[in-house]
Amino acid sequence: MSEVPRVALLGADLILSSRLRSALAARGVALVAAPKDDRLPDVSLVFVDLNSDTEARLEAIGRLRLRHGGAMIVGFCDHADRDLRRRAMAAGASQVVANRRLPDAALRLAAVDGTVR
């Protein structure tokens, strides 16, 4: 039996994680969520919620980049928070998307990554 492709989420927002989980599940991709980066599995696509606990999540991006150098690390936050987007990129994020674009971005990036067939 083949393993279900997985995408990871570092965050605790139930509404955003539910939206992300639903979008990915429709394409046969499982979302593995964890409140701390040391609990995330080794996957090639990681989403990081920058809407809360911002400083800790920025530090987590740096640790994730060190541990999973080739992973696509995607932060998400309010579209107007340009400074946070810049800081996330400086910390090692591959890109940062607006909250409202999260489900679409997840499907697009999972397809590029090869997670979605």
Residue ranges of predicted features:
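Conserved phosphotransfer microenvironments
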Residues: F47-L64
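Output/docking surface of receiver
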Residues: G92-D104
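Short beta-strand elements of ligand-binding domains
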Residues: M72-D78
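N-terminal first-folded block
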Residues: P5-L45
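Alpha4 helix (beta4-alpha4-beta5 surface) of REC/receiver domains from two-component response regulators
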Residues: A80-S94
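Non-catalytic signal-transmission and effector/linker regions of two-component phosphorelay proteins
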Residues: M1-R6, A111-R117
